[in-house]
Amino acid sequence: MNKIRKFFRGSGRVLAFIFVASVIWLLFDMAALRLSFSEINTGILKEDIMRREQTGFRVEADQMTILSPSSRGMRPPRNGAGGKESFRKAENRVLKVEENVDQVQRKGKMQFLLGRGKAVSLWHRTHVQTLPVTLPMQKTQGRDSKPEVSSLHMMSKQTTVLGSEKDSFTVSRGVPLNKTAEHTETLDKKQEAPENYNLSSDTSKQASQRALNVTISVRTDRSKQQSQTVTKSSIQFASLPILKPEEVTVTKKTEAQGKDLKYEAHKARPLLKFTADVGHLKKQSTNETGLGVLPEADGAKVAPGKKLNFSESQIVIITKEEGQKTDTKEVPNSKIQTVFPKLLGESQGKHIPRSQSQTLSSPLAPKRAVSQSKPTLAEELHTARSNLTAKATTVGHQQSHANISENPGKHHVLRIDVTLSPRDLNAPGQFGRPVVVPPGKKKEAEQRWKEGNFNVYLSDLIPVDRAIEDTRPAGCAEQLVHNDLPTTSIIMCFVDEVWSALLRSVHSVLNRSPPHLIKEILLVDDFSTKDYLKANLDKYMSQFPKVRILRLKERHGLIRARLAGAQNATGDVLTFLDSHVECNVGWLEPLLERVYLNRKKVACPVIEVINDKDMSYMTVDNFQRGVFTWPMNFGWRTIPPDVIAKNGIKETDIIRCPVMAGGLFSIDKSYFYELGTYDPGLDVWGGENMELSFKVWMCGGEIEIIPCSRVGHIFRNDNPYSFPKDRMKTVERNLVRVAEVWLDEYKELFYGHGDHLIDQGLDVGNLTQQRELRKKLKCQSFKWYLDNVFPDLKAPVVRASGVFINLALGKCVSIKNITVVLEDCDGSSELQQFNYTWVRLIKHGEWCVAPIPDKGSLTLYPCDNRNNRLKWLHRSASAFHPELVDHIVFESYQQLLCMEGNFSQKTLKLAACNPTEPQQKWKFEKYYDV
C-alpha cells in the first residue's frame, strides 16, 4: 500500500486524477458518438425504405456508385480481320457460401427478390410488378430432405436506371420495337464507355470490400426464414439492360477465360429484361465448360435410305478437347445443402440417364435437387384448341436414352443475358434499334449489300453482342420447365456468311442460353471461299470451349451440311439454326421442355424479323403458323381473330404447325435418325422443310411453334448462295421428289399448279428407299394429314367432276364401248361420270378422253400424266383466250381446236375453235377451287 500511496503524493496525485478523468471522458464521448451514428443511420434507413416502397425500389441516377471502368465493346473487324481474343478469359471458381447476415438483412427491410420480375408484354398495357419466390421443399435421392435455395436477395444500391417506365402497345408483324432513337454512325466516331456501377450495400458490413454480397433465402416454412450470404470476390456482371432492380445475373468464371473478364449489371428500360432468373435455383454457373473428346463414331445411323457418310477426307473438325468432371461443394449449414459444379479433370463424355439425374450429374451440367411436388407447366394449361394449339402430353412419353423421372423438380425459365464485356448502351443498333447509314457512306453500303444480300455495312457497325428487347408474351417468364432438361447441340451451317452476322449468331446463343444445356455449338463450314472464315474464324472461336468448327472439303449444300453436323453432334437434342440470327432471352428452355415431354415433338421458336435494311429487331404476330400453298410454297398464315376468340387461344399457347420453316427447330437426335433424317437424295437447298414436316406428322410426330421462344432472323429477298446447278431447277427437283414420295394421289394437285414440272421430266433419282422407309415407319396417308393436321388447306383431288354437259344441246357425254358419245343426261349413270384433273386430263376411271390422230373423232386411251396428247384446257384458257372460257381446248396442236358436239349423230369431234359456236361450250356438274 505504501508503494501505491507514493504515486498519489504531490504532483503524482494530480496526474493520476487527470488520467482517470480523461479515460472516463473518452469512453463517454465514444458512446455518445456511437448512439448518434445509430440514430442517423436508422433515420436514413427508414427514409430510404419509405422512398423505395413508393418508387418500386428504383435507383435514381444520383445514387449510382462506380464499380470499375468499362472497356469499349469489341467490334467485328471488317473483311474478316481477327477480333479480340484476350477479353474472354476468366478463372473458374466455385461459389462459397458463408454465414454473415446483419440485422437489417434478417428483417428483410433492404432485401428484394432477384430475377423474378413479371414479363411485360408488348401487346397489352401491363403494370410492372414484383412477384414473390416460393418453391417447395427439395430433396435428392439417397439423402436427407433439404430445403432448396428459393430466392436471392441483394442490397439496395446495386443496379442503375437507364430510362423511365413506359406503357406497351400492340405491335403488328414487321413493326420495329424501337421507332425512335435512330443512330447515324461514322467509322471515325468515338464512343464513350458507359460507367460501371458497384454491386454493394451501404448497410452491409462488407461495404468497403471489393466483393459481391448476395443473400440466399431458404424457406423452411411460411413463418420462418433463414439466410446465408454468398460471397464471391472479384466478380462483376455483364452490362445487361434489365426490367427491375431485383434482377441480377450470378456468374462464374472458367479456367479457360483468364482473370481479366469483367461482368457488370445494369438497369435499362422497363420493357427490357436481360438477366438470369436464378432466384429459385442453386447458383448456376455461366461459364463455358470444356468439351470432351469427340467420339470416333456416332452411334446414330441414317435410317433406311441412302447412307450419307462424311469420311475424314470430307470433313475437317476444328475443336478444343478439354475434359471436365463435376464435383459438389456443400454449404456449411445443417439445414441447407447447395450443390455447385466444380471442374476437376477429364470428362467421360457419357450420357447419364435422366432417371439417375438425382444422384449423378452430367459432365456438362451441375447437380440439381429434385422437387417433391409436381407443379403444372404453364404451357400445358391450354390444350386442344380447334386443331391449332398443341394437345397436352403426358409424361408417359420417353425421352431418348432416358426416362422422365417420376417426380422431377421444376424451375422458372431462366432469363440469361451474359456478355463478355460491358455493353456500350449508345452503340448503333443497341436494343434492336434501327440504324441509319451516314450520308457519306451510302455508296459504300450499297456496294457491300451484295456480300450478304442485306445491309452488311450496318451489320458491321452493330456490336456482335448487342442487346435486344424481350419480346415474349406476358407470362412466359413465369412458366415452369423441368430441372433435368436434355442437353442440345446447336448446329449452324454456313457458306461465305458475313463475319459480323455469324459472330452475332454465336454470341446470342452463348449469351442467352443456360450453359449447362449447351453441349456444343457446331459451325459447319460448307466449303466457304472467304479468307476471313478460315484462320481468323478459328482464332476467334478458340476462346469459346464449346464452339467447334466442322469444315467440309467440298460443297455439299445446306441439307448434307446439316447431316454432317448431326453425325458429329453429341447432345441429346439437335437444334438447327441459321447463321444470321439473334436468339432472344429465354429462347432455349421452352424448346427443350417440349422435346423432354415427348421425344416425337419438333419444337420451333417464333421467328422474328431482323430488318435487312436498317438491322432493327422487329416483332411478329403471336398467332402465326407455318403453312404451304400449292405447289408447296411455304408461307406464314395468321390464325383468324374469330377462331382465336372462339377457342380462347392465348398468346402463350403452343401452336400446332402444319409445316415448319425449316431453318430453326429442335428435334430429339435419336428420333431424327429414326425418321431417316433428311432425304439424302435432296440437293443443296429447298424442299427439305416440306419433306421433314410431312415425315414428322404422318409418321407419328408433331411440330409445334413455341410462343415463349423467340429468335430473330434476317429475311432476305434473294438467296446469295451459289448452286452447283441452276437454282430454280434444283429446288423444283427437290419438290418433285417430295411430292412423289409423300403426296399420294394429291401429287396431281401439286403438278396442276406447276404444270411445267411434269413436262420437264426432271430426274429425281431413285425413290425406292424413301418409299420403303415410309412403309417401315407405318406412316399415315396424305389424306390423313389433310384431315387431321391441315384441314383448312383446300386440296380437292380434281378440278371438276360429275356429268359433262353440252350447254347448247343439253346432252351429256357418255361411254359406249371405248368410244365417246352424247346421250340424255343421267346423273346416276356411272358411264357419264368424268373427272377433270389437275394435270388437265378428262378421266373416266383409268381411261382418258382424247382425239384419234388424223381423224378428229374422240375415243378413250389409257391415262398417262406425262402424255400431252391427252390434255385439255378448260376455264384455265381464259388467261390467254378469255372468249374461250367455256370451251374445251385441245392442247397438243398449234392451231386452236375445240371439242364440239353433234347431237344428230351423237358424236364428239375436234373443230376449229369458234367463240360464238354454242355446241363448243361445255360445263361439268361440280367445280372445285383452291
Swiss-Prot record:
Signal peptide: none annotated. The keyword Ligase does not apply. InterPro entries: GalNAc-T (IPR045885), Glyco_trans_2-like (IPR001173), Nucleotide-diphossugar_trans (IPR029044), Ricin_B-like_lectins (IPR035992), Ricin_B_lectin (IPR000772). One of its GO terms (molecular function) is polypeptide N-acetylgalactosaminyltransferase activity. It is a single-pass type II membrane protein. It catalyses: L-seryl-[protein] + UDP-N-acetyl-alpha-D-galactosamine = a 3-O-[N-acetyl-alpha-D-galactosaminyl]-L-seryl-[protein] + UDP + H(+); L-threonyl-[protein] + UDP-N-acetyl-alpha-D-galactosamine = a 3-O-[N-acetyl-alpha-D-galactosaminyl]-L-threonyl-[protein] + UDP + H(+). Keywords: Disulfide bond, Glycoprotein, Glycosyltransferase, Golgi apparatus, Lectin, Manganese, Membrane, Metal-binding, Phosphoprotein, Signal-anchor, Transferase, Transmembrane, Transmembrane helix. GO terms for cellular component: Golgi apparatus; Golgi membrane. Residues 163-210, 344-377 are annotated as: Disordered. Residues 485-594 are annotated as: Catalytic subdomain A. The chain crosses the membrane at residues 13-35. Residues 1-12 are cytoplasmic. Residues 197-210 have a biased composition (Polar residues). It is found in: Golgi apparatus membrane. Residues 180-193 have a biased composition (Basic and acidic residues). Mn(2+) binds at residues 578, 580, 713. The modification Phosphoserine is found at residue 285. One of its GO terms (biological process) is protein O-linked glycosylation. Its main location: Golgi. SUPFAM superfamilies: Nucleotide-diphospho-sugar transferases (SSF53448), Ricin B-like lectins (SSF50370). Predominantly expressed in sublingual gland. Expressed at lower level in stomach and small intestine. Weakly or not expressed in submandibular gland, parotid gland, kidney, liver, heart, brain, spleen, lung, skeletal muscle, testis, ovary, cervix and uterus. Its cofactor is Mn(2+). This is Polypeptide N-acetylgalactosaminyltransferase 5. It comes from Rattus norvegicus.
